[in-house]
């Protein structure tokens, strides 16, 4: 970098040529097949030269057979070259087809960012210089380009620049590049390229102008600004003139007064270069900059340690700079943050708000607003602020109108966004009108725009979102106020309010009162009375309030006849309203009673099932006890030799069985032994459970253990089935499946790993399909100690880059839906929502790469028909779950207060009944002791301990009586 600047500055009359770097890029721009051909030709030439002059003599003295071999070798080389050419032609044809596909897709959706990038890459690979230039130009008009895209474009143009006109074209590209984002590397390239044109007219002034602008833009950059300072300083040092030495001194002093990394090295270099002693002012500025550097270092180190996009670190850095209040540094840190967070609308809003309120520099403010809407075109707040800023700084009407039209085509994600942008533009048009004139061009334009706004919301917006976004008719209300207050045209205002009421707003009291207040201020008493009478008849939400307003007006302005009529109408209306409310209350009470009856029925059914289950369980336990008693009586010898017993159970011969039968008959007791094998599945499960030792749960290993649930109950050997799945995450120490008393697998288990990172990696297997069911994998947490612990992988807030799709056919697969969604952008993730059994629910979540692709997909896919199912597509914004209020814990009189842990993880149940008779709950009054010790807790009577035990049926009867 420094060498290039120095050499170029010392030889101003020589035009710098593209070096090896540019040549290498030209090679990269060539098709891969051409490069292979050139490489093959070079290798052949080197081989011919390596043969030496004796090669021709050997050819002359060679035999006929040698000539045949040479012909064979030549034909082989020709065939190899032909194969390479065929491979290149095939690859070129494939690239051309892909280029055509991308161009067709961009003709449908020009805002597909990834398609633009891929098209430029393929055109550059094919060497289509004119087409790649046009593709880059089109993309730069729609999107701000990243530093990498600009540098690639600039390097290509620099390598092709041949004369002064081409150099001016490259200068224009540099000027466009530095406006998109703050890029120190682009400024450095700009400065170095301008050094190459120093021999032209005004070349020296051009170089200095570029470097000075670079210092103003990125010279304060603590980590990357040093390169700009060094390049500028070395350029000035290369010009050996006495007058230029002071320029180098000035650059050193300016650099040392700014907190930058490696300041000590720059100071040492200045001391070595300068022949004069260091001035005191320079030392003071240097020490002050060092002190500032120490304050900034924690924030810079936080940025270096964090990973992109580092939004939180940048926000903290911005807050710190805002407290200090240096405008240049505040602007720099905002620009640095936006390089990595260009798709964060809130960051653009905060930056533009600071410029609007603090700096108020026209060019800077409008430039930032323009970049903001190019980066986040779907954010209506940025467009609104842009229009206000343009009006604030006095831009012409045509420019503001064109910007508004661009906003309408930006593709907002909500219908209300269009209402907001229309309101901002209509407010601007209203401020242009001189209402002292009866008629003007501006007033006619305002009225025509009000009409167009209503048509646009009714047609364009309602067709796209199934709603106009303006249910309260705010735009029509604004129009009515303009006509009534500023144009004295109450007739038009009344027509507008009639239209507002016919759009479903006549039942709201606030709408009638708004109209009444307008008539009160700019109309007459007759129309006020008429409006209130209509309001009394139509209002359904707050009729009492409207009736009160009518009576108040008649009390102050009406006659006796008006008062009587108002009383009659209000009483009739309120009586009807009360009757309707009573009917609604009765209907609601009937529904509540019906729900209670259903709940009681469900309780009764559950109680019966529970009693039946307990009865079966009791019978099973009695049967097992009988079997155990029988085994104890006849199996004493087998208990002494358990290994022998297991062998005889599986390999008992018929002769041994008959001998045992004879032995039992002689002893006078009959014992029937069933030697037939039981069900294989139950035998295997029972033996697996019997052979597996019981392991107590060790809570100290929760960090290396995961809990796996929702597994199919039909798995015969869970450990064998699950071990290969989890071994990809790391060493599996143990898998502990849980079985029932009968040896059946209960569908969940614990998996213990050797390392904690393996357990964390295993959580990524959550929702993996195992034999048709989604397997749930969650951390191993003791719910008794953490009752509120819940694991939910997905966000429950608004995600503008993710779509929620409903109404899908159950037969729709993930691959089919992904193919549909890919047509509108890059799909990062797609998830079909299923139930616990793995069956689809007709819902899906689709995550796109950015918000613009998601908004385009909503507009294109909403209302689409898939297999006769009309799907609905919206931005993912799950509704907030209501947190149930914790009921007040009531205890029986005299009952001891129990801690929450005694009730379990969920606390007390909803129904808390004290099943202790009231007679036993009453306790004698504690003796009052004024100066004695506090009485001890009352001891419960011993009668309570002798109360008969109640069965489940008794409890159910008590609940049903309630």
Curated annotation (Swiss-Prot):
Subunit structure: Component of the 7SK snRNP complex at least composed of P-TEFb (composed of CDK9 and CCNT1/cyclin-T1), HEXIM1, HEXIM2, BCDIN3, SART3 proteins and 7SK and U6 snRNAs. Interacts with AGO1 and AGO2. Interacts with PRPF3 and USP4; the interaction with PRPF3 is direct and recruits USP4 to its substrate PRPF3. Interacts with USP15; the interaction is direct.
Protein name, per record: Spliceosome associated factor 3, U4/U6 recycling protein
Biased composition (Low complexity): 1-21
Tissue-specific expression: Ubiquitously expressed, with low level of expression in liver, heart and skeletal. Also detected in hematopoietic cells (at protein level).
Region (Required for interaction with USP4): 488-521
Chain segments annotated as coiled-coil in the UniProt record: 559-618
GO cellular component, one term: nucleoplasm
Region (Necessary and sufficient for U6 snRNA binding): 538-952
Location relative to the cell: Nucleus, Nucleoplasm; Nucleus, Cajal body; Nucleus speckle; Cytoplasm
Species name: Mus musculus (Mouse)
Region of interest called Mediates interaction with PRPF3, as start-end residue ranges on this chain: 2-352
Effect of gene knockout: Knockout of Sart3 is embryonic lethal.
Modified residues (N-acetylalanine): 2
Domain of life: Eukaryota
Role according to the record: U6 snRNP-binding protein that functions as a recycling factor of the splicing machinery. Promotes the initial reassembly of U4 and U6 snRNPs following their ejection from the spliceosome during its maturation. Also binds U6atac snRNPs and may function as a recycling factor for U4atac/U6atac spliceosomal snRNP, an initial step in the assembly of U12-type spliceosomal complex. The U12-type spliceosomal complex plays a role in the splicing of introns with non-canonical splice sites. May also function as a substrate-targeting factor for deubiquitinases like USP4 and USP15.
UniProt keywords, alphabetically: Acetylation, Coiled coil, Cytoplasm, Methylation, mRNA processing, mRNA splicing, Nucleus, Phosphoprotein, Repeat, RNA-binding
Positions of the UniProt region annotated as Disordered: 1-92, 591-696, 880-962
Post-translational modification Omega-N-methylarginine, affected residues: 906
Motif Nuclear localization signal per record, residues: 602-609
Residue ranges, compositional bias (Basic and acidic residues): 591-602, 680-696
GO biological process annotation, one example: nucleosome assembly
Ranges for domain RRM: 704-782, 801-878
Region (Required for nuclear localization): 601-670
Induction: Up-regulated in proliferating hematopoietic cells.
């Amino acid at each position: 970098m420094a060498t290039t600047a120095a050499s170029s500055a010392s030889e101003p009359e020589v035009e710098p040529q593209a070096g090896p770097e540019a040549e290498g890029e030209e090679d990269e721009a060539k098709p891969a097949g051409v490069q292979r051909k050139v490489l093959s030709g070079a290798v052949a030439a080197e081989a011919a030269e390596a043969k030496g002059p004796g090669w021709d003599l050997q050819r002359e003295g060679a035999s006929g057979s040698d000539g045949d071999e040479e012909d064979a070798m030549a034909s082989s080389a020709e065939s190899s070259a032909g194969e390479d050419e065929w491979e290149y032609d095939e690859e070129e044809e494939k690239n051309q087809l892909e280029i055509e596909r991308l161009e067709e897709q961009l003709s449908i959706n020009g805002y597909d960012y990834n398609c633009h990038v891929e098209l430029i890459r393929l055109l550059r690979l094919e060497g289509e210089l004119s087409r790649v230039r046009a593709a880059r130009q089109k993309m730069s008009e729609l999107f701000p380009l990243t530093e990498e895209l600009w540098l690639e474009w600039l390097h290509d143009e620099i390598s092709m620049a041949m004369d002064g006109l081409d150099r001016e074209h490259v200068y224009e590209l540099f000027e466009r590049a530095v406006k998109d984002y703050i890029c120190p590397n682009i400024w450095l390239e700009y400065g170095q390229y301008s050094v190459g044109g120093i021999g032209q007219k005004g070349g020296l002034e051009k170089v200095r102008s570029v470097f000075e602008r670079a210092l103003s833009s990125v010279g304060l950059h603590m980590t990357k600004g040093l390169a700009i300072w060094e390049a500028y300083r070395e350029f000035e040092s290369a010009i050996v003139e006495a007058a230029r030495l002071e320029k180098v001194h000035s650059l050193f002093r300016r650099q040392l007064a700014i907190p930058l990394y490696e300041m000590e090295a720059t100071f040492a270099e200045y001391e070595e270069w300068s022949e004069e002693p260091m001035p005191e002012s320079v030392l003071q500025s240097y020490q002050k900059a060092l002190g500032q550097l120490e304050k900034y270092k924690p924030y810079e180190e936080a940025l270096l340690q964090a990973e992109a996009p580092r939004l939180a670190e940048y926000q903290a850095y911005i807050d710190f700079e805002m407290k200090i209040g240096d405008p240049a540094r505040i602007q720099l840190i905002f620009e640095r943050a936006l390089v990595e967070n260009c798709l964060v609308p809130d960051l653009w809003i905060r930056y533009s708000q600071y410029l609007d309120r603090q700096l108020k520099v026209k060019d800077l403010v409008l430039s930032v607003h323009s970049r903001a809407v190019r980066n986040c075109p779907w954010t209506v707040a940025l467009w609104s602020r842009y229009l206000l800023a343009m009006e604030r700084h006095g831009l012409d009407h045509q420019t503001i109108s064109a910007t508004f039209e661009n906003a309408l085509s930006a593709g907002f994600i909500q219908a209300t966004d269009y209402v907001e942008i229309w309101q901002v533009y209509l407010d601007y048009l209203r401020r242009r009108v001189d209402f002292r004139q009866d008629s003007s061009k501006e007033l006619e334009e305002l009225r025509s725009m009000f009409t167009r706004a209503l048509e646009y919301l009714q047609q364009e917006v309602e067709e796209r979102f199934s709603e106009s976004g303006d249910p309260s008719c705010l735009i029509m209300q604004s129009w009515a106020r303009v006509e009534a207050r500023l144009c004295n045209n109450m007739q038009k205002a009344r027509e507008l309010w009639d239209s507002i009421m016919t759009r479903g707003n006549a039942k709201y009291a606030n709408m009638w009162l708004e109209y009444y207040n307008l008539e009160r201020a700019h109309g007459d008493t007759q129309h006020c009375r008429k409006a209130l009478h209509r309001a009394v008849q139509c209002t359904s939400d707050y009729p009492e309030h409207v009736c009160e307003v009518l009576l108040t007006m008649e009390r102050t302005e009406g006659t006796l006849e008006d008062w009587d009529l108002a009383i009659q109408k209000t009483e009739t209306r309120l009586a009807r309203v009360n009757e309707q409310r009573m009917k609604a209350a009765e209907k609601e009470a009937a529904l509540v009673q019906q729900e209670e009856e259903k709940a009681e029925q469900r309780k009764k059914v559950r109680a019966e099932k529970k009693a039946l289950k307990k009865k079966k369980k009791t019978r099973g336990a009695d049967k097992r006890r009988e079997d155990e008693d029988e085994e104890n009586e006849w199996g004493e010898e087998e208990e002494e030799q358990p290994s022998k017993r297991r062998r005889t159970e599986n390999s008992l011969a018929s002769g041994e069985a008959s001998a045992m039968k004879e032995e039992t008959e002689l002893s006078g007791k009959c014992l029937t032994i069933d030697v037939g094998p039981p069900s294989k599945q139950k035998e295997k499960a029972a033996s697996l459970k019997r052979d597996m030792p019981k392991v107590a749960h060790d809570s100290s290993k929760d960090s290396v253990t995961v809990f796996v649930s929702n597994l199919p109950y039909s798995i015969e050997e869970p450990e064998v089935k699950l071990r290969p799945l989890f071994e990809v995450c790391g060493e599996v120490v143990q898998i502990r499946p849980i079985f029932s008393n009968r040896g059946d697998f209960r569908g969940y288990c614990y998996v213990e790993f050797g390392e904690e990172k393996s357990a964390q990696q295993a959580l990524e297997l959550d929702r993996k399909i195992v034999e048709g069911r989604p397997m749930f994998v969650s951390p191993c947490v003791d719910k008794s100690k953490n009752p509120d612990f819940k694991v939910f992988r997905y966000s429950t807030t608004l995600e503008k880059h993710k779509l929620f799709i409903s109404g899908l056919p159950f037969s729709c697969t993930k691959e089919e839906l992904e193919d549909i969604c890919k047509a509108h952008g890059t799909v990062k993730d797609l998830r079909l929502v299923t139930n616990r059994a793995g069956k689809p629910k007709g819902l899906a979540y689709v995550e796109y790469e950015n918000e613009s692709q998601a908004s385009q997909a909503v507009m294109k896919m909403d209302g689409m028909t898939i297999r006769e199912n009309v799907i609905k597509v919206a931005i993912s914004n799950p509704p907030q779950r209501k947190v149930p209020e914790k009921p007040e814990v009531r205890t029986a009189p005299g009952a001891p207060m129990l801690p929450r842990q005694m009730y379990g993880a969920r606390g007390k149940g909803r129904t808390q009944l004290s099943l202790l008779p009231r007679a036993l709950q009453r306790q004698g009054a504690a003796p009052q002791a004024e100066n004695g010790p506090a009485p001890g807790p009352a001891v419960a009577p011993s009668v309570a301990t002798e109360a008969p035990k109640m069965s489940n049926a008794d409890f159910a009867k008590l609940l049903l009586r309630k």
